[in-house]
Amino acid sequence: MQQRRPVRRALLSVSDKAGIVEFAQALSARGVELLSTGGTARLLAEKGLPVTEVSDYTGFPEMMDGRVKTLHPKVHGGILGRRGQDDAIMEEHQIQPIDMVVVNLYPFAQTVAREGCSLEDAVENIDIGGPTMVRSAAKNHKDVAIVVKSSDYDAIIKEMDDNEGSLTLATRFDLAIKAFEHTAAYDSMIANYFGSMVPAYHGESKEAAGRFPRTLNLNFIKKQDMRYGENSHQQAAFYIEENVKEASVATATQVQGKALSYNNIADTDAALECVKEFAEPACVIVKHANPCGVAIGNSILDAYDRAYKTDPTSAFGGIIAFNRELDAETAQAIISRQFVEVIIAPSASEEALKITAAKQNVRVLTCGQWGERVPGLDFKRVNGGLLVQDRDLGMVGAEELRVVTQRQPTEQELRDALFCWKVAKFVKSNAIVYAKNNMTIGIGAGQMSRVYSAKIAGIKAADEGLEVKGSSMASDAFFPFRDGIDAAAAAGVTCVIQPGGSIRDDEVIAAADEHGIAMLFTDMRHFRH
């Protein structure tokens, strides 16, 4: 599979010029003739490199404000010409073979992401000549190397040095695959953007435009193959976005432990996204994609101790997420106390990693610190289709709550209500969360009946000897009947936070008043399926 091809002539035309001068210098130093266009040619000439403008090579000038510059037979014939088969016709038409094409495309995604981007701006940033050259070179990878990523520059020069100025077929094939992936992603962005504008062109409201395109094109890059999927008979892999804009499990670096499983990744995502909701030092422990213990504290050790107390049994073999650096004291507490599958935090101290290294199977991930949450899309696969929605980034503050009962909540009840409301957002529906003094004391998850979730939360608290009296309870959706309030009151809950919106709200509020419970309406639901 060697089939080496020497690189004697290269065409360089890039929008992102990072590293291009150094790459061109390396090519030129190895005797490669340089062809280039527009701004790339000017930059290389300014750096003293011998470069031929494509317009001089073709004898045809750039025109139409640069719209037409590489669409010429002398360019595409040089790229597509099959060595040993098309030599005679290339010589007849004075077409020189081009052995390498270095191209990246107009910044369409960056253009349309700018506030106030007009349709005209978007149109002018649709690259035509670039993708055409990329596809031509990729098609003829048997003879031509196509380079679309600056991260490949160094490896290409090294291989040329190792092969007397040549590249192997295996390398050219790999570069061709990257090229087709690159143009596919580029065309997908364009199709998605214009597809989302179809409603406006049909006279529909502005709100209807810019939401979801009529054809959804998705591009994800494989990060790793999994040993198996959710179950051992299922094959699986982990794919990530090319440009992840927020610290996440997709951006995380594994600094210790055996390979992550499918379920590890799913559970780690659930834990990390939950802990991001808190500004104070916080810990979230997750089992089977549900929080089983959450707390905030004076330190992450304090938060971990309190989160663990919610449900030590379920915490065994769980995933632990922090919103502060993992320190040695906390690492020691975890390793001494329980078996843990994954620990994820923005960072981990060297001392902490020395401690966790004693348990080689423990996976430790660092994801970097996060800032503002980034809007995006959530997907749910159904047989034959895909459900798409905005990420649930909704959250209410104290000033947005409505007190609907006779009794007002105390300051501590209010703090606990807001705390458990944040947790309930990440618990599978029907979700009920009991909290007291900024820690969960009982969680009822995934029940078909809301009242049973409330009962389970109370049972969990009782099993761990945690006092429910004076606690707050969050429900991810409204109570359809008063029975959930009666169950909470029986357990000792004194404050309830819920969306409201049931046709029996009056009945539910009356039940709260009967029990002396303060009730807050959020007017926002957090179903999670």
Swiss-Prot record:
Annotated ranges, domain MGS-like: 1-148
Keywords per UniProt: Acetylation, Hydrolase, Multifunctional enzyme, Purine biosynthesis, Transferase
Any one GO CC term of the record: cytosol
One MF annotation (Gene Ontology) recorded for this entry: IMP cyclohydrolase activity
GO biological process: 'de novo' IMP biosynthetic process
Reactions mediated catalytically: (6R)-10-formyltetrahydrofolate + 5-amino-1-(5-phospho-beta-D-ribosyl)imidazole-4-carboxamide = 5-formamido-1-(5-phospho-D-ribosyl)imidazole-4-carboxamide + (6S)-5,6,7,8-tetrahydrofolate; IMP + H2O = 5-formamido-1-(5-phospho-D-ribosyl)imidazole-4-carboxamide
Record PTM N6-acetyllysine, positions in chain: K287
This enzyme's EC code(s): 2.1.2.3, 3.5.4.10
Family of the protein in this entry: Belongs to the PurH family.
UniProt comment concerning the protein's domains: The IMP cyclohydrolase activity resides in the N-terminal region.
Protein known as: Bifunctional purine biosynthesis protein PurH
Species this protein is from: Shigella boydii serotype 18 (strain CDC 3083-94 / BS512)
Highest classification ranks of the organism: Bacteria, Pseudomonadati, Pseudomonadota, Gammaproteobacteria, Enterobacterales
Annotated gene: purH
